Amino acid sequence: MIRKLLILSICIPMFCGGQIFADECKPSGDLRYICGPVNAEDILPLGNTKWLITSGMNGQLINTHDKGHIYLVNRRDKTFEELFPGKKPVFRPDKKMFSACPAPIDPENFSAHGLALKQISTNRFHLYVTSHGEREAIEVFEIDAQGRKPTISWTGCVPLPDNMFSNSVAILADGGFVVTKFFDPKVPDSFNSIFEGKITGCIYEWHPGGRVKVIEGTELSGANGIAVSKDNKWVYVAASGTREIIRFNRTQSPVKLSRVRVSIQPDNIRWGDDGMLYTTGSNYVPPDECKSSDCNTGWSILRIDPETLKTIRVTGFDQTATLQKASTAIPVGNEIWIGTYSGDRIGYLPEP
């Protein structure tokens, strides 16, 4: 069904075309690449280690036959490898925590999209993944980075409603989560409606032992990236369809949304060590000005003050950069790492 949605008469810059195959891996100015990771839509650091985790979406959204992956990246020597499924995927189901999970993940039919990490002890983490494929679910893993190289095991899942194409997830203190509904795959033309600024999704919340529930009043156009404050009180969301950053207090009912308009189609939202939020996305161009399948618009990185929602453009690259369709930007050390949902590489550049 998703494939049918994407046979469009107009190429929407955020999602159409621009898939990069194995061409040269030369830098685009200050932007350097690690070539090989396919559709690495999201990137997160494993604490203070030298390791990064990236997602790897399957080809469902961009009409390719790519399979889903989770990648491990060494940010010091700039190498990567497949972490999951790998040669021998490990399954250690936590049936008490994830009692509604019907079966282990199918390593041949999943799509690792958005990521969230929670540290549970020294160099041990829970990883939550918005996943598509055989089922729409939050797939949960445990990563142990105490040894020479991190290991991963699948531990459970939380099935999501079947009228939901999820995008991003953020973990709450009790092991629950908030997750964005990007669009409804059961509604004809729901995906395209995002780019008309129409309501297509909202925010859901889940807690252990409970059900996945809508947070009323969070209806948005293309609810995409999501982040929560340290006290779990404030939620920040990227609304791609209306090109907005949203903030609300999840402890209040009904919620009241604060909004700020931005110049890009914002994707993932990530915290930096400086206490600021960072987002990236394709530079906005009206669809009727970008009709060809190879149309690229470049992308920009924005820094957002979580208190005022004031945004500042940090840097960006035009349509000539080899990496296009940027979906995540996260400062790690003295670098910013860039992911894309449509390509064969991740990028990194010195933090300006």
Q: Which functions belong to the PLM regions below?
A:
Residues K325-P352:
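Blade-level signature of beta-propeller repeat domains, shared across WD40, Kelch, NHL, RCC1
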Residues T54-G68, V129-T130, V179-K198, T279-T297:
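Short, conserved, GDST-rich strand-edge loop motifs in beta-rich repeat architectures
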Residues D23-N39, I152, I312-F317:
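A short helix->beta-strand "capping" segment at the edge of beta-propeller domains
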Residues K67-R76, A137-A145, G197-H207, N296-E307:
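Beta-propeller blade signature
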Residues E142-P150, N249-Q252, P306-T308, P350-P352:
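Short loop/turn segments immediately following beta-strands, especially the blade-tip
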Residues S263-G316:
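Loop/turn-rich, solvent-exposed surfaces of beta-rich toroidal or solenoidal domains
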Residues I53-F91:
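Beta-propeller domains
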Residues P37-N48, H65, P89-Q119, W154, ...:
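Beta-rich, blade/repeat-based domains predominating
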